[in-house]
Amino acid sequence: MRWYQAAITAALTLTFLSPGTASAQGRPCAGAKYSDSHFHLTNYIQEGTDVKDYVRMMGSTVCRSTLFGIPLQQAWDYRNTGDFAPWYYLQSDAPLYYYSFTDAFIAMAYKSLPAEQQARLDPMITGFNPTDMYAADHIRRVLTTFPGVFSGIGEFSIHKEFVSSKVAGGAASLTDPALDRILDFAGEAGMVVILHNDINVPFPKPGQDPYILAQLKAVLERHPNTTVIWAHVGLGRIVRPVTEQLVLLDRALSNPALSHVYIDISWDETAKYITASPEAVAATAALINKYPDRFLFGSDVVAPTSLDAPMAVYNDYQPLWNALTPEASQKVRLGNYQRLFDAARVKVRAWEKANVGKARPAPQPTPSSGAGVAP
C-alpha cells in the first residue's frame, strides 16, 4: 500500500494547491443554491448541451455539477417509426443499445474548458454494459486514456422501468458477477458510483415481495469500500414507494454494513412522491434530518437549453427544503457533494498516478463468482 499512500499525498498536494480546485474557487459557489449530483449533458440520441453553455448556465446558482451522458442510444428503426426520428426511449418500440463513445465525448468536452471551469465539474463514465464481464476493463481503459478527467461512474441502470426491457441483449441483474467486477474496480480506483435501480417492479400485485430490495442490499454489502449513490431513492414514473419505505431506508442508513451508501433525491418524478402531502414532506424531512450526511440533491435534467429546467426541479423540492434544518439543507444541497466528490478526485488521481502506463494486473476474483477472468 506504500504506492497508494504516496500517491494520495501527491494528489492531495495538487488538489489543494491548484487554483482551479474546489477549495480555491469560492467565488462561483458563494451564494449558490445547490451542486448537481445528477446531470445529463446529452440525451438518448447523444445530442445535447454544449459544455461551455452549461458552465455559463450554472453561473453563481449552481456551485458544482456532475457531467455525464446517457449510456444508451435509442435506435431509429424505420420499420417502426418511419420518418419520425425518436429522441426519447418512450417514443419508439425499437431497442436501446449501449453507446461507449459517450465517455470519449464527455472527456473531450471537459478537456475543452479552462482549468477554473473544469474545477466545477465532475465527469462520470457511463458507456459500459453492466452485463459484460469486460465492463470493468472498459472503465479502467477510459481512466488510463483520459487521466485527470473522471471522478466516478454512472448514472448506469440495472432495473429501470420501461428501459430495462428495451435494452438489446441480456437483461442487467443485481446478481450478475459483472456488476461485482464493476463495483470492485470502482472501489479500487476510489470512484463514486451513481446507480439507478428501481426499488420495485412497475404495477406490483398486492402482497408481491419486492425481491429487488434483498438483491440490492446483498450487492451493496459485498462492496463496503465502494462509495455508491442510489439514484432517485429507487423511485420512478410508475415505480411507487413500497410499504414502509422510509422505515426501510432508516434501517438501511443505520446499518454499519451500508455506511458507504448514499441517496440522491433527484428528478421531478421523485419530487411528486416526496411532496405529495404535508405528511410525506414531514416524514421525508425527519429521515434526512436524522441522516443529513447521506443525501444529495440532483436535477436529473437531460440536455437543457437553459437553467430553467434544473431550477424547476429544485423548486419542486421547495417544501422539503423548508422542512429541513438549515444544517441538513446545506449538506443535501451543497456540502455532501463537495465531500464525496473531493474525496473521489483525490483517490482517482492517486490511482491514475500509480497505474497509467503500467502493466495491467491480472483480474481479481469477484465476490459472487469466486473466479476471475483471464486477461
Predicted regions and their residues:
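Bacterial N-terminal signal peptides that target proteins for export
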Residues: 1-8
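Catalytic pocket-lining loop regions of alpha/beta-barrel enzymes
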Residues: 160, 167-297
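Mid-to-C-terminal alpha-helical segments outside catalytic/metal-binding sites
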Residues: 23-35, 46, 50-65, 289-296, ...
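Active-site gating/metal-coordination segments in enzymes
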Residues: 26-28, 32, 81-201, 267
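Acidic-and-aromatic substrate-binding clefts and catalytic sites of carbohydrate-active enzymes
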Residues: 41-50, 72-76, 96-102, 128-136, ...
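C-terminal segment of classical bacterial N-terminal signal peptides
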Residues: 14-23
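Hydrophobic faces of well-ordered beta-strands that scaffold small-molecule active sites
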Residues: 35-39, 64-68, 119-125, 152-154, ...
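An N-terminally biased module of ancient metal coordination in phosphate/nucleic-acid-related enzymes
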Residues: 24-108
